[in-house]
Each structure stands twice: as C-alpha cells, then as structure tokens.
Amino acid sequence: MGLPWYRVHTVVLNDPGRLLSVHIMHTALVSGWAGSMVLYELAVFDPSDPVLDPMWRQGMFVIPFMTRLGITNSWGGWSITGGTITNPGIWSYEGVAGAHIMLSGLCFLAAIWHWVYWDLEIFRDERTGKPSLDLPKIFGIHLFLAGVACFGFGAFHVTGLYGPGIWVSDPYGLTGKVQPVNPSWGAEGFDPFVPGGIASHHIAAGTLGILAGLFHLSVRPPQRLYKGLRMGNIETVLSSSIAAVFFAAFVVAGTMWYGSATTPIELFGPTRYQWDQGYFQQEIYRRVSAGLAENLSLSEAWSKIPEKLAFYDYIGNNPAKGGLFRAGSMDNGDGIAVGWLGHPVFRDKEGHELFVRRMPTFFETFPVVLVDGDGIVRADVPFRRAESKYSVEQVGVTVEFYGGELNGVSYSDPATVKKYARRAQLGEIFELDRATLKSDGVFRSSPRGWFTFGHASFALLFFFGHIWHGARTLFRDVFAGIDPDLDSQVEFGTFQKIGDPTTRRQAV
C-alpha cells in the first residue's frame, strides 16, 4: 500500500529495531555532511589575511564552530591566527573532518545491520512477547549519558584539564585565541559574555542531568502520570524531543544574533547592535583621545589604531545589511578588503571639525549630512542644488586623513571631498577589491545572520511540530474515534500502523 508523504514514518511504529536503524542512519547523514562541509570549506578558504579577510567575511559556516571548540591548525601548514605551523597534530581541521566521515561510515553500516536484524530479543516485552520499549527507562539512560557528556565537556574540555579550552577574546575581538577557562561560580557566571559561565553551566547542568538520569532509572513513574502523559507511546517521545530541539534552536538564535561568549566576533563577525550603538567607534575615539593625552600627534594617535578594530567599524560587516535572499559571502558583496585608507577628518573654511552622520542599519541610501561637535548641521550634499545652503562647495569643506594608507593626505577638491563623505557614512573607509570575485557591490550577511535566520525559522517550524505531535499523542483516543463511554474491551492503537498483521480487523 502506498503511503502519503506525511505518513511514511508510520513504517517504524511498533518496530523498535528499525526505529533505531533510521536514527543511526540520520546520524550518519549529519556526521557525513559535517565532515564533507569542512573539506569543502577548507578547499575554498583563504587563510592568508586573518585581519581583513577572516573566515566570516569568506562565508565560512562550520569552520567557526570548530575553531571556537579549540581547533586552530590545518594539515596545510597554516594556523587560523596567521602564520605557518610545522606540527598541526591529529586534531586539525582535516583530522576532525576525517573523524566525522569515518563515524558516518560506521553509523551507515550499523544502520544497515539494525535494519536487517530488527527483531532482537531486547526489543520484546518479557511478559507479552510483543515488541515494546521501556520508554521511561530509556529516558533515564539517555539523560544520564547526556549528563556525563555535558559534565565532561565543562569540567575537562573547556577548563583545559583534558582538552584545549575554548576560544576567548576581549570585548572588541582583537586578541582572540584558544585557552583554558576557569568556571565562574559567582553572579558573573550568568553574564552571557563571560566565558567562565560556559564551564560552570556545563558542569552544573551535567551534574543535574546525571542525578536526574539516575532518578529516572531507579524510580518508576506513578500510574496516573504514566497514563496522563502517555509515557507508553513513542509519539510522546517525538513530541517532547521536538520541544527540546526547538527550545534550543530559539536560544542559540538569540545568543548568535545578540552576541555572547559562545559566538565570538572574530569567528562569526560583529553583531548589528555594535554598529547601531557605535560600539567600535567609541572605542576607537577613546584610544585616540588617550593617545592625544600622551602628547601624540593626531596622525600618530590614529596610526596606533589596529586595522582589525577599524575594520569592525564598517557597515559592510553588519550582518543585518545583507538581504535574506542574497546568496554568497560578504566578500562576494562589497569585495575583499585590501587595506584601511585612514580616518577622514572634515573641516569647513571656518575651521569647525565636521562629522559625517552615519547610515542606520536598515537604510540603503541616506543623505550625506555633516555636523559639528554640537550636532549643528554645517554641510551636506544637497538633493536640489538650486536651493542648497550647506553644499560642500559653498561651505568650503576639506578632508584630511589620519592613520591608514592615506595618512597625512588632504583634499580640498569638492568632488573628492564628497566622495569620501559618502564613504564615511559607511564607517571607516577601506580599499575593497571587487574584481577578484566579481563582487557586485551589494552587501551580504555574515554567517551570524544565516545561522540566526535558519535556526529561528526551523525553531518556529518545530514549535508547530511539537504542538501537532503532542496533540496527537494526548488525544489519540479522541482522534481514533473511540467512544469514551464504550464498555467493551478495545485494542488501543487499532489501525495505527498500516499493514501490521497484529492489528485487529473487522471483516467487511
């Protein structure tokens, strides 16, 4: 009998062996995809410039996740932090990819074995001889094992006790590296930007999981609770598992989009809120002010600004600037960054220092307006020149660069001044190579944006899946049309699985 697409999974109902088989095959597919994706990304990744062409500018998706867990070296002889290495060891990017592909192959074979040998004694109830699973016991086993893995990750991998630690950086994404992390047991452990919270929460959650697993292995559920929550029905497991997954997906969508210690900006790119709040701009100005206080010249103060910090303060690195349906990496949009031209300082003929008003995140075009230190508009690039009062030509605006490639260069030509004023709307000014990748000049999102969009979308979908399967399992008797006032014995689950010879049939 042909099944409609939305009912095909009924073939593994009441068939524990093959239910296990298809889940092992799913693990094989996921692991195989992960390993293959790493190899693909390594084939197209250019590690030569970690400052101006980092992984997130190149659209890498799995490499950042490996890196935050402590993988930094390649068998190709390069390190993610720049420079060359001679002994990357087995746990390089390629080594991890190979391990996933080998796991995929083993899971593939295990899935075939369990599909062929589906009728195992372990899946049969000793009393009735029918296929059945002790779901509360299985829940306890899985909870215990997940707790052990969670505790082990927090206590050994993250702390560096037996493992590399995790990626840790400063608030401005400049000094990131893999290092051991001590657990934070105080209130600071609840700050999402404190790496120590990752260790302490995994240790605490793992301990709780181990204790809860042992509880569920040693204590049977009360009969009324067992029946009320339909603990004997495999669809209850499906429903609650979907709930766990969609909840996790919503959480990680939030930690990715808003930023946290688990999503360092060096690996995933800055967040849109850092542009909205002028986060990097404030730090740059603070450093310049500190330099001036040390009697440095303006040129020297700006020259001390790290190119990496200046690059974060550029709207093209804002993940909200790329459309959801613009495929490709950031480099395919505005191009590959080649160098920082320097910080432009605009002045009018009266000597006022002018600041270009920056483009807000969700604008594609924005008027060029220059204001003084008090916020008073002093110059602009007018839409209608006939009525202009503040045009660059009328006000006599000049621009001088400090730091970067154009350090000390000044322009008074109005066309050139307007060109740099337009570019200053977008933050710090960079030379971008659009020829190499045939970049089209239209901004793209970073992996931070793609991850958030994907996980938020699937979380919503899985939320409805949880409601659907939860309702099906809780109200199965209602949906099956069994009269609750029926006195006669009814075989529960009649016609639940099409083609099952054990299902009672009524002769027509």
From Swiss-Prot:
Q: What is this protein called?
A: Photosystem II CP47 reaction center protein
Membrane topology per record: Multi-pass membrane protein
Phylogenetic lineage: Eukaryota, Viridiplantae, Streptophyta, Embryophyta, Tracheophyta
- Cofactor: binding details: Binds multiple chlorophylls. PSII binds additional chlorophylls, carotenoids and specific lipids.
Chain ranges passing through the membrane: 21-36, 101-115, 140-156, 203-218, 237-252, 457-472
What keywords are assigned to this protein? Chlorophyll, Chloroplast, Chromophore, Membrane, Photosynthesis, Photosystem II, Plastid, Thylakoid, Transmembrane, Transmembrane helix
Query: What is the purpose of this protein?
Result: One of the components of the core complex of photosystem II (PSII). It binds chlorophyll and helps catalyze the primary light-induced photochemical processes of PSII. PSII is a light-driven water:plastoquinone oxidoreductase, using light energy to abstract electrons from H(2)O, generating O(2) and a proton gradient subsequently used for ATP formation.
Q: What organism, scientifically named, is this protein from?
A: Piper cenocladum
Which InterPro entries does the UniProt entry name for this protein? Answer: PS_antenna-like (IPR000932), PS_II_antenna-like_sf (IPR036001), PSII_PsbB (IPR017486)
Q: State the Gene Ontology BP annotations.
A: photosynthetic electron transport in photosystem II
Which coarse location class describes where this protein primarily resides?
Answer: plastid
Task: Give the location in the cell.
Answer: Plastid, Chloroplast thylakoid membrane
